């Protein structure tokens, strides 16, 4: 689990003396790290009784051509670039902003696969 509360250190490097401890609502979850493979989803219960769909694996993307505005589904071949983490390129992990190669051309992922449960992308070439 990840803790998403405020830091225990000040900007100067000194310790902050907290008036209280950690709270459960400050906890986060590990990232989904969506890989290129046969589609695999996971439902997660979130705060307020809501649900979030985590996309663990995916091999298809909804690709929009900005010139004509049409969206088509195409298989994902590989990850070419990922600004989130340079090591994600070798591991073929999809995140928002990653550049993927498809039969239609290179595209940039615009959705958040670990949060939305789908891979949407826009052609860049």
From Swiss-Prot:
GO biological process: translation
A GO MF label: structural constituent of ribosome
Record's keyword annotation contains Glycoprotein: no
Keyword Ribosomal protein listed: yes
Entry GO terms, CC: ribonucleoprotein complex; ribosome
InterPro entries named among the record's database cross-references: Ribosomal_eS8, Ribosomal_eS8_CS, Ribosomal_protein_eS8_arc, Ribosomal_Se8/biogenesis_NSA2
A Pfam short name: Ribosomal_S8e
Keywords attached to this entry: Ribonucleoprotein, Ribosomal protein
Family per record: Belongs to the eukaryotic ribosomal protein eS8 family.
NCBIfam families with a match to the protein in the record: eS8
Record text on subunit structure and interactions: Part of the 30S ribosomal subunit.
PANTHER family to which the protein is assigned, alphabetical: 40S RIBOSOMAL PROTEIN S8
Designated name of the protein: Small ribosomal subunit protein eS8
Taxonomic path: Archaea, Methanobacteriati, Methanobacteriota, Stenosarchaea group, Methanomicrobia
Gene name as annotated: rps8e
């Amino acid at each position: 689990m990840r803790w998403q509360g405020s830091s225990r250190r000040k900007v100067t490097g000194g310790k902050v003396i907290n008036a209280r401890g950690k709270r459960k609502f400050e906890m986060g979850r590990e990232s989904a790290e969506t890989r290129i493979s046969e589609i695999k989803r996971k439902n997660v219960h979130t705060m307020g009784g809501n649900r979030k769909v985590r996309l663990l694996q995916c091999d298809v993307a909804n690709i929009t051509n900005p010139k004509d505005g049409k969206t088509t589904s195409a298989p994902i071949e590989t990850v070419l670039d990922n600004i989130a983490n340079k090591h994600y390129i070798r591991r073929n992990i999809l995140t928002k902003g990653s550049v993927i190669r498809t039969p239609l051309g290179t595209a940039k992922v615009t959705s958040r696969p670990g949060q939305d449960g789908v891979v949407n992308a826009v052609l860049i070439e």
